[in-house]
Amino acid sequence: MENRNSFLQNFRGETLGNISNESSSEEIFQNKVLRPILKLQNDLFIEVVKNQINKHKNDFYNFPVEKKLAYIEHIIKNDIKFRNSLKGIIISLFTIDEYNDYIQNSSNLNKRMMNMLIERIKNQVQLLDVVIAK
């Protein structure tokens, strides 16, 4: 397992964000594990969200920006299958130790994970405007 763990940590890159003596275990996990994974998987998340939008065949591309932002938040928070798929993309890049840390506090870490992902996608909403031809 050490090869996989080393590979994943090197592949993801350095810690993003500040870690101090006052940082909670959740903040440390967020900055050491979640942020690098979200950054690494960013392009995939954009494509996955585009696909989800197109599957629902709504009028997303004609929505005003505020409604697009609300829709992004809605599909990530309320579509359980979709949310679980997004979590799987993230969790699959955990080391065994990170996974063991994660399961100790998965509820709070899931909230952090999804909130960070929602903000990341919202900040890049213009990338979703490229319609996928089906």
What positions do the PLM features span?
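Generic hydrophobic, helix-prone segments enriched in Leu/Val/Ile
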Residues: 20, 34, 71-72, 91, ...
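Long, highly charged low-complexity segments enriched in Glu/Asp and Lys/Arg with interspersed Ser/Thr
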Residues: 105-134
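N-terminal leader/targeting peptides and immediately adjacent processing regions
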Residues: 1-35
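Amphipathic protein-protein interaction modules
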Residues: 63-113
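Membrane-interacting alpha-helical segments
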Residues: 57-72, 124, 128-131
